Amino acid sequence: MGFLTVLYLSLAALSVTNAAQIMSAPNGAEVVPNGYIVVMKDDTSKQDFASHRVWVSGIHHNITRRGLDGEGVKQTYDFDNLRGYSGIFDKDTIKDISNDPKVAFVEPDAIISQHVVVQQRKAPWGLSRLSNRKGGRNYVFDSTAGAGVWAYVVDSGVDIRHAEFRGRAVWGSNQVDNQNSDGTGHGTHVAGTIAGKTYGIAKKAKVIAVKVLNSEGKGPTSGIIAGINWSINNARQNGMLHKSVINMSLGGSYSAGLNHATAQAIKAGIFVSVSAGNDNINSNNNSPASEKSVCTIAASTEDDGKASFSNWGPAVDLYAPGHNILSARPGGGSQVMSGTSMAAPHACGVAAYLIAKEGIPGSRACLRLKQLSQPTIHNPGPDTTRRLLYNGSGR
């Protein structure tokens, strides 16, 4: 047994009375069996984090040697101001982990889903609406069109060969399976709204596919966090932190870990757009929609009303078109989808557009969107903004 392991065993034994909270899964939440996310305290150094992982590996080795079930650590997260990991652990191991004084909290690894509700055949209208204060049939935009901005689509994958992207889409990371493709069409539709040549807002932006949802449109919270972590690191490595946007048209039950991870992207300088959810309830109970620093987007209809399915509440920053939205589908062609999943990429696209046009950093883009927005939603829901997305075209 190494010195670091002995040291950590000693510290854990001394800290039982100060054990970190082991959160319960929200009622009705689908969770990964024996899956947990462990978040360290803010003041945990890289050295302390490394020592903790050595100690956890030692515990896991002892478990497997005794023939008990448990896969151990599967993913590690290392943001600027947040460190943690996820994995499969038995209850005794999780109890030991929670006793480490460097652990802030432990929560179940819940399943996250895409926010799409219906598909119909109908003409698009969202682009023209966001570029005209009182509505119109034409999409009016500046020729910069998101040039020089990177859009990370944290979703079900993207058909990067689709003609809508004209070679501007690339594969980034896969945190959920070994299929580098879009199994649901959701991510491709979202990407098309952000940056497609026909259906997109920021028509010159680069699209980066970050797959976190499987062919059923679901994925573990741990994988979503890993996708965010990868996106931040990739933007940093390429000098794009303040010229990048992230879209997450997904959500699930409240997760402190997911909210903390999403906030790290904002702190790093990246704009983040998330969908409010499709349950017609207060979005304060969902993640990542409830994270205050992100831009949470609810869905509007063609007549500037709240879409019947859209979540609402004080967490909502803006409304954007989310009903009967036409965009790209895998394999070529297009399809119509509805949902707050379709509203969020409208905001993400306008953010990318404004970053390129006005030179604002991504971390300030949500504020700029709210400054430009118009108070036209006529039935927004209790304690909810009336403001509708607008690109500032002057029309």
UniProtKB/Swiss-Prot annotation:
Domain annotation Peptidase S8: ranges: 124-395
BP GO annotations: proteolysis
EC number: 3.4.21.-
Active-site residues per Swiss-Prot or TrEMBL entry: 155, 186, 341
Gene Ontology cellular component terms for the protein in this record: extracellular region
Compartments (UniProt record): Secreted
Pfam hit, one: Inhibitor_I9
Domain Inhibitor I9 per the UniProt entry, residue ranges: 36-112
Region feature Disordered, mapped onto this chain: 374-395
UniProt-recorded Gene Ontology molecular function terms: serine-type endopeptidase activity
Span of the signal peptide: 1-19
Database matches in InterPro entries: PCSK9_ProteinaseK-like, Peptidase_S8/S53_dom, Peptidase_S8/S53_dom_sf, Peptidase_S8_Asp-AS, Peptidase_S8_His-AS, Peptidase_S8_Ser-AS, Peptidase_S8_subtilisin-like, Peptidase_S8_subtilisin-rel
Glycosylated residue positions: 229, 247, 391
Source organism superkingdom: Eukaryota
The entry's keywords: Glycoprotein, Hydrolase, Protease, Secreted, Serine protease, Signal, Virulence, Zymogen
Propeptide position ranges: 20-115
Biological role: Secreted subtilisin-like serine protease with keratinolytic activity that contributes to pathogenicity.
Family: Belongs to the peptidase S8 family.
Protein name: Subtilisin-like protease 5
Species name: Arthroderma otae (strain ATCC MYA-4605 / CBS 113480) (Microsporum canis)
Record lineage: Eukaryota, Fungi, Dikarya, Ascomycota, Pezizomycotina
